[in-house]
Amino acid sequence: GIVRYTKMKTATNIYIFNLALADALATSTLPFQSAKYLMETWPFGELLCKAVLSIDYYNMFTSIFTLTMMSVDRYIAVCHPVKALDFRTPAKAKLINICIWVLASGVGVPIMVMAVTRPRDGAVVCMLQFPSPSWYWDTVTKICVFLFAFVVPILVITVCYGLMLLRLRSVRLLSGSKEKDRSLRRITRMVLVVVGAFVVCWAPIHIFVIVWTLVDIDRRDPLVVAAL
């Protein structure tokens, strides 16, 4: 609908389309990943291994970058309404979406190159083969993902919505409008939902991966194995 109908081509809806596109690509890999876990091997060859692993990273980064840009977009709309007339256009939203995919390619393309299939214990595994020393590049990759796909976006989103709420609060106090007061409460709830959903969805996996990478834990512990 967003692609076909002109009325839907607002900056916000174009960002939503980008989220939907990233999620659709990720969904297309689920049958292969499900089969891998059920069969305990990778029967689909190296080409699909490269595609599936790179799409995972593309989805992670494009989704988070898009959500972050939506926060910046809302901040500009609320705090700088005059600038918003020039910034919040469909053409610029499309350009930003393209830039998001280009930035995500900085991770997605190397992942595609490093993804390989290897025999292991009578099965085939789809894995990332890092340059030597592999432990070092594996650790660097996980730290970079943690910073740029979680910590930095959370900071940007929190700052944007915090400034937006301060602006709306000052407007409400100046006008004393009950309608603006209700609007502030609605937007406050929306902010809590957006930031809360972001943290709830991404924090567990990012924290688990960074702890797994940096902390010396017993990987044979049944609780650790269960968490995997």
Curated annotation (Swiss-Prot):
Cellular localization per UniProt: Cell membrane
Gene Ontology MF terms: G protein-coupled enkephalin receptor activity; neuropeptide binding
Record's signal peptide: none
Keyword Transmembrane found: yes
Cytoplasmic side: 4-13, 73-91, 167-189
The keyword Membrane is annotated on this UniProt entry: yes
Disulfide bonds: C49-C126
Post-translational modification: Ubiquitinated. A basal ubiquitination seems not to be related to degradation. Ubiquitination is increased upon formation of OPRM1:OPRD1 oligomers leading to proteasomal degradation; the ubiquitination is diminished by RTP4.
Membrane topology designation: Multi-pass membrane protein
Protein keywords: Cell membrane, Disulfide bond, G-protein coupled receptor, Lipoprotein, Membrane, Palmitate, Receptor, Transducer, Transmembrane, Transmembrane helix, Ubl conjugation
Extracellular side: 39-50, 115-134, 213-227
Membrane-spanning segments: 1-3, 14-38, 51-72, 92-114, 135-166, 190-212
Domain of life, per lineage: Eukaryota
GO cellular component, one term: plasma membrane
Pfam families, per the entry: 7tm_1
GO annotation, biological process: G protein-coupled opioid receptor signaling pathway; neuropeptide signaling pathway; phospholipase C-activating G protein-coupled receptor signaling pathway
Tissue: Detected in myenteric plexus and smooth muscle (at protein level). Detected in brain and intestine.
Family affiliation: Belongs to the G-protein coupled receptor 1 family.
Subunit: May form homooligomers. Forms a heterodimer with OPRM1. Interacts with GPRASP1. Interacts with RTP4; the interaction promotes cell surface localization of the OPRD1-OPRM1 heterodimer.
Task of the protein: G-protein coupled receptor that functions as a receptor for endogenous enkephalins and for a subset of other opioids. Ligand binding causes a conformation change that triggers signaling via guanine nucleotide-binding proteins (G proteins) and modulates the activity of down-stream effectors, such as adenylate cyclase. Signaling leads to the inhibition of adenylate cyclase activity. Inhibits neurotransmitter release by reducing calcium ion currents and increasing potassium ion conductance. Plays a role in the perception of pain and in opiate-mediated analgesia.
Protein name, per record: Delta-type opioid receptor
